[in-house]
Amino acid sequence: MNLKITINQQASISEKLIIANLEQLLIFRDNTFNKIDCDQQITLKDAVQISQILNDQGVLNYEGEINEQITTYLEACGLYSQGQGQFIKRTLQTKKINIPQQDFNNCYGKYDYIEQKFQNQINFFKQVDLKGNQETIDENELLNDGVEVKQVESCASKPRACANCTCGRKEMEEKQDKEQLLEQLKNNSVKGCGSCYLGDAFRCANCPFRGLPAFKDGEQVKVLQDDVFLKEKEETDQIKLENGKVKLMI
């Protein structure tokens, strides 16, 4: 079957000749025509469509102006020039390739098969035979009437009570320290620091006046058991400052 591509479609259509234009090429199937006559200016898209509907060794007679660009389009679509505007479509050559069958027994990466035998499972709950000469343990020997109590480390060898003392030694030592300080004050003892009157910031850790505000020489204080109170306008124990040292006058 032949195809004539032209703008003028007034000619009669026969069974062996079809007259159409470039816009109608999409309606044709592949490998439809043996010969195509074309007198229109074709583009690369038109050359691709002409190559698709032309049979192998089919002939294209191009009646338009032939230039280098048209020739390049047609050659890119698989047609070669025969001169005088005639182009022939190349036959696609196919060659059968025989691929040898691969021997998978010696292929790379295959490992030798090693048959693995499963070991006999050990029965951990197997009944023990008591008829033998096996020694048994008397359960009565495991019992002990005595209760094991962890012995608390003694602090008798330490000079002072522990920081987290729970035996009462810490409270007893604090009470003894307070009694000793009060006894020293009542016996007209002299404090070596000489800064009790300045306030808590300048007093010792065991100073009996801790907690009291700063006082001046001649102010009256009253000592009642473990506490020291600041009193005014009462005749009681008197504190005096002599040579930078504090004395309790009883």
UniProtKB/Swiss-Prot annotation:
One of its GO terms (molecular function) is 4 iron, 4 sulfur cluster binding. [2Fe-2S] cluster binds at C155, C162, C165, C167. A motif (Cx2C motif 1) lies at residues 193-196. It holds the Pfam family CIAPIN1. Residues 1-102 are annotated as: N-terminal SAM-like domain. GO terms for biological process: iron-sulfur cluster assembly. A motif (Cx2C motif 2) lies at residues 204-207. InterPro entries: Anamorsin (IPR007785), CIAPIN1 (IPR046408). It comes from the Eukaryota. [4Fe-4S] cluster binds at C193, C196, C204, C207. One of its GO terms (cellular component) is cytoplasm. Its main location: cytoplasm. Signal peptide: none annotated. Residues 155-167 are annotated as: Fe-S binding site A. Residues 102-149 are annotated as: Linker. Its cofactor is [2Fe-2S] cluster; [4Fe-4S] cluster. Keywords: 2Fe-2S, 4Fe-4S, Cytoplasm, Iron, Iron-sulfur, Metal-binding, Mitochondrion. Monomer. HAMAP family: Anamorsin. Belongs to the anamorsin family. Component of the cytosolic iron-sulfur (Fe-S) protein assembly (CIA) machinery. Required for the maturation of extramitochondrial Fe-S proteins. Part of an electron transfer chain functioning in an early step of cytosolic Fe-S biogenesis, facilitating the de novo assembly of a [4Fe-4S] cluster on the cytosolic Fe-S scaffold complex. Electrons are transferred from NADPH via a FAD- and FMN-containing diflavin oxidoreductase. This is Anamorsin homolog 2. It comes from Paramecium tetraurelia. The lineage of its organism: Eukaryota, Sar, Alveolata, Ciliophora, Intramacronucleata.
